[in-house]
Amino acid sequence: MKAQARFLVLGAVLAAALSSASALPPDGAPSKEEFVPDPLLDTMQTELRRASVKLSRADPPAYFLSYSAYDGDALTMSASYGSLLSSFEGRFRHAGVIVRVGSPELDNTHGQNRRTAIVQGTLPLENDPDALARSLWWLTNRGYRSSAPAFLKVKTDTAVRSEEEDKSNDFALEPPQSHVDARVPALGLDIAEWQARLRRESAWFRQYPEVYDSEIVLQDQTSGFRFTSTEGSRIAEPNHLVRLVIEAMTRADDGMEMIRVETYQAPQPADLPSEAVIHFAIEKMAADLQALRAAPVAEPFAGPALLSGRAAAVFFHEVVGHRLEGHRQRDEEEGQTFTKKVGQQVMPAFLSIVDDPTLSALAGEKLSGSYKFDDEGQPAARVQLVQDGVLRSFLMSRMPIKGFSQSNGHGRAQPGLMTTGRQGNLIVTSTNTVKESELRERLIDEAKKQGKPYGLYFEDVQGGFTLTQRGLPQAFQVLPVIVWRVYSDGRPDELVRGVDIVGTPLAALNRILVTGDTMHVFNGICGAESGSVPVSAAAPAMLFSEIEVQKREHSHERPPLLPAPGFEGREKAAGAGKPQGGSR
């Protein structure tokens, strides 16, 4: 059994058979929709029709094919301490071909064989129909040669293995979709202007000798997603995402490495924060790192804790979100924490959860997990996962599970990987709220009630991960970066370092006492079996009766022996005035 962690960081079927002439109308367009020409999509659909006729008559027959393509431009530039490190701009076209052999009831993706259905490759950058068709033809040939023997193996394994508990089909039949917006947006930024800006912004770290490494990275990517299938879907949708990532690192005297990361994401470069905002963020990052170097190492602890909204959002992404992904309810290697709890209370009744990829912004922030169509060509949809503490649904791709036979628009994947049910915009709401400013006093009251000398306040996090497979502990780990001891006797709050939140889901969820009244958003990149996809999680701050923390593993490499260039002779003066731990 392979161990697999899901992590979060700050940073589709033919109705009957392919031989049916009605699967694709003669002109290649979905019925009852106006045909919108697009050279790449048109070539994909023409070659798909040709392949479907042949492969539907093969032995064993292919009953479903789909082509997807990602066509766009990407620009990445980075700078450190006032100088450019890199600047790359390029065009790309990637294709994914899915070939399903057998029938919707049983096909080559059954069990642990999902990856056999997809092959990936590059496409010509120019709209030459012959060159594009040739590439798609070769990928389709590879796809069938992978899928056909996999299906024969599935049939053999099914015959000799014990009966499965979930006897759902392997693929959900869905109506065809049509939406063609063939624009591929321009990158839309002035390269020279942004190179100069990154030089200026990265130079601000020069004044902080205890920041040992820092970098600012700008990523601007535009793409046009195209999708067509033998069921008649025809989709083209543009996308534009810009990310500005600021990273800074230092090391304590005991060798512990501390990293601060700030990530800003937007649909356009103009929507990124101003230089003044970035300057303030860098000053705070440097101050945080300086304070963390001097902060004491936290000890293992179990007691009351307050999670900021961002920390609570990551907590729910890891603890709940991954465990509500549909395929995990069917995979017998998974822990299936919530599989048989539909209709049961799984968390306090004042909490509800939806996943809504149709929402583009929340609480004044753009959401990274937004999309119109998922990677299986299904329209995005709002899904009520938990209502008043009661589990209602799962995040579904086109892989059915017991009790949930259709997709709800959450089939997502990194290009070239097989889709699974994934999170988009996970939103946690509460009906048991107090003003956010009151939560600290509530934390102190809870610590006094339990006879604890302090509670913990988790101000910011950098991400987390979770283990979901049986045979492994059904545990999660959230990685905080700014953590405070909030003393119950009135002493100032004390900054600590080297601490991770750990626990198991069912126990942790039922220790939430009350929440704040303000929503906070965490945008990040989530990695799992179907690759890395952009996601958002939103939640209010939350007070827990008990959170368990453990010491974080760290290296024992010493800080640099030499002072930073330009700071020779200043180390004594700097040492005399440096903070002996953070307090507030």
Q: Where does each model-flagged region fall?
A:
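Active-site bordering "gate/hinge" segments
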Residues: A5, A23-F373, Q378, Q387-V390, ...
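Bacterial N-terminal signal peptides
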Residues: L8-S19
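Short linear motifs in exposed loops
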Residues: P238, L395, L495-R497
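Residue-level structural signal for beta-strand termini and adjacent loop
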Residues: V261-T263, S397-M399, R497-V499
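Hydrophobic alpha-helical bundle architecture
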Residues: G369, T429-A507, N523-S530, P534
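Short loop/turn microsegments at loop-to-beta-strand junctions
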Residues: P379-A381, V481-I482
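Conserved catalytic-core segments centered on acid/base and nucleophilic motifs
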Residues: V383-Q387, F394
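C-terminal, non-catalytic macromolecule-binding modules
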Residues: R392-E446
